[in-house]
């Protein structure tokens, strides 16, 4: 991808993010790649058929509109499902980074790996494919993921009949920070013997399995099979759609937890932010251990880079990346683990195809499009409510209540104003998060505070202080 194409694609993604909101963008578009731009069409790709179908059904017009703002002559968007594994050395050195599902995968081979079942149990129960490289041994531990790693290890090392310490275990983070790696590691480790049945499913696989069971009138067998699992591992829960499917997931979740079976779940946001999920599901998920995997620190990024180089040497013994180059990459590439792996893949490809050693100059040229500006902190409505409540000495439940006393109304209006100005939530969404209020109530609050801060210096200082606290 040339610099011009990269810049154009970045602008289109920015328009799309502004159009649909941050949460929708993260759920449905974060893994969409630009493949090619033709005179009248644009070729995009996504990793799964489910994503392709959902985007085509619900967002095709928005995607086309965003592209037409950049290239008016574009009249068609071609969306395809890309191969889950792209061989690095089969492409030119400047090819874009792989966007594979599994986080922190080592760049061990330049050919595709066949996915294999963890055990006959996992295979017979129709589990989602597992990558044999995603184990605890290949997971790089750092400050941002220590708790998630420790909790996952404890789950994996448990035995049938042991008391369950935290249930469910809910891991959330942004894209490419290691959630899938940990979940598949739990599955691999748990299925090393025959004592326990550990099943890994993506939310997409769960949906398709349940819908297929309904169509073939085998839903009872589907339910019984799931409820006989010792450890159920569900990935990408944010994609779970449909009231009937969500109800069945809730019943399965309750049945397993009540029976003392372990449930492990991963998603791209905390349970409270999964607005498309039924409140009962969110409540049950929040009742377990909720662990956030924070963005990768520089030391952890360096550790991941080193591990990928070691893995690559297993098949390319002469491949080497000097320490100054690794340190440069760790400082410059800050977004996620996939970009780090993509950088090593590019250096490996360039070095092998051109028979040249890796240098700092080569690295600066090859990864320039992976160096992104630092993203601002993502502020959540729950954070706004918590900090505003603390500032004005009221409770969060007061902000959500119908109370109309002066000591509650003003903080509530300030919180709504901050939610509108510091997040990408729509007015109706903000209203729902403030006790189910109408969007006109939110609009009134926003306009009220906008008018007051220009005249009331005390209120203006309070709002500025709240913004600083939220952005720290």
UniProtKB/Swiss-Prot annotation:
Q: Where is this region: Domain III, AAA+ region?
A: 129-351
Chain residue ranges for the region called Domain IV, binds dsDNA: 352-472
**An example Gene Ontology CC term for this record:** cytoplasm
MF terms in GO: ATP binding; ATP hydrolysis activity; DNA replication origin binding; lipid binding
Residue ranges of the region described as Domain I, interacts with DnaA modulators: 1-73
> Where in the sequence does UniProt note compositional bias of the Basic and acidic residues kind?
97-112
User: Quick one: where's region Disordered?
Assistant: 92-127
GO annotation terms (biological process): DNA replication initiation; regulation of DNA replication
Where, in this chain's numbering, is ATP bound? 176, 178-180
Keyword annotations: ATP-binding, Cytoplasm, DNA replication, DNA-binding, Lipid-binding, Nucleotide-binding
Give the matching PROSITE patterns: DNAA
Region entry Domain II, spans: 73-128
Q: Where in the cell is it found?
A: Cytoplasm
Tell me the superkingdom of the source: Bacteria
Q: What does this protein do?
A: Plays an essential role in the initiation and regulation of chromosomal replication. ATP-DnaA binds to the origin of replication (oriC) to initiate formation of the DNA replication initiation complex once per cell cycle. Binds the DnaA box (a 9 base pair repeat at the origin) and separates the double-stranded (ds)DNA. Forms a right-handed helical filament on oriC DNA; dsDNA binds to the exterior of the filament while single-stranded (ss)DNA is stabiized in the filament's interior.
**What does the entry note on its domains?**
Domain I is involved in oligomerization and binding regulators, domain II is flexibile and of varying length in different bacteria, domain III forms the AAA+ region, while domain IV binds dsDNA.
Q: How does it assemble?
A: Oligomerizes as a right-handed, spiral filament on DNA at oriC.
Tell me the HAMAP family matching this sequence: DnaA_bact (MF_00377)
Q: Which family does it belong to?
A: Belongs to the DnaA family.
**Per its record, how is this protein called by name?**
Chromosomal replication initiator protein DnaA
Q: Which organism is it from?
A: Rhodopseudomonas palustris (strain HaA2)
């Amino acid at each position: 991808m040339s610099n011009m194409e990269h810049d154009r694609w970045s602008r289109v993604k920015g328009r799309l993010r502004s159009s649909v909101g941050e949460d929708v963008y993260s759920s449905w578009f974060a893994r969409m790649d630009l493949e090619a731009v033709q005179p009248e069409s644009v070729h995009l790709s996504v990793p799964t058929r489910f994503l392709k179908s959902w985007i085509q059904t619900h967002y095709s017009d928005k995607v086309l509109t965003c592209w037409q703002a950049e290239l008016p002559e574009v009249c068609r968007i071609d969306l395809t499902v890309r191969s889950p594994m792209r061989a690095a050395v089969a492409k030119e050195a400047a090819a874009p980074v792989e966007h594979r599902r599994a986080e922190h995968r080592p760049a061990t081979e330049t050919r595709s790996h066949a996915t294999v079942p963890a055990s006959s149990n996992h295979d017979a129960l129709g589990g989602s494919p597992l990558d044999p490289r995603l184990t605890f041994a290949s997971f790089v531990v750092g400050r941002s993921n220590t708790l998630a790693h420790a909790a996952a290890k404890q789950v994996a090392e448990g035995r049938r009949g042991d008391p369950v310490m935290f249930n469910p275990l809910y891991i959330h983070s942004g894209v490419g920070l290691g959630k899938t790696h940990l979940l598949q590691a739990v599955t691999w480790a748990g299925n090393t013997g025959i004592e326990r049945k550990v099943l890994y499913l993506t939310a997409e696989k769960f949906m398709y399995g349940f819908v297929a069971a309904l169509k073939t009138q085998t839903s009872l067998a589907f339910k019984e099979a799931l409820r006989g699992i010792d450890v159920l591992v569900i990935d990408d829960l944010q994609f779970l759609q449909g009231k009937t499917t969500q109800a069945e997931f809730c019943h399965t979740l309750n049945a397993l937890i009540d029976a003392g079976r372990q449930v492990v779940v991963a998603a791209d946001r905390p349970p409270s932010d999964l607005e498309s999920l039924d409140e009962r599901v969110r409540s049950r998920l929040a009742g377990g251990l909720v662990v956030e995997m924070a963005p990768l620190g520089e030391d952890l990024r360096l550790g991941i880079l080193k591990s990928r180089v070691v893995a690559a040497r297993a098949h390319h013994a002469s491949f080497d990346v000097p320490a100054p180059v690794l340190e440069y990459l760790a400082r410059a590439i800050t977004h996620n683990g996939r970009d780090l792996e993509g950088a090593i893949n590019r250096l490996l490809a360039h070095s092998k195809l051109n028979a040249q050693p890796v240098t700092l100059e080569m690295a600066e040229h090859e990864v320039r499009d992976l160096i992104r500006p630092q993203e601002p902190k993502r502020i959540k409505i729950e954070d706004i409510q918590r900090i505003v409540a603390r500032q004005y000495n009221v409770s969060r439940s007061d902000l959500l209540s119908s109370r109309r006393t002066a000591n509650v109304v003003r903080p509530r209006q300030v919180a709504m104003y901050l939610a509108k100005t510091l997040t990408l939530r729509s007015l109706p969404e903000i209203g729902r998060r403030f006790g189910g209020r109408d969007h006109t109530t939110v609009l009134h609050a926003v306009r009220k505070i906008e008018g007051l801060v220009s005249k009331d210096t005390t209120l203006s200082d309070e709002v500025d202080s709240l913004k600083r606290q939220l952005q720290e």
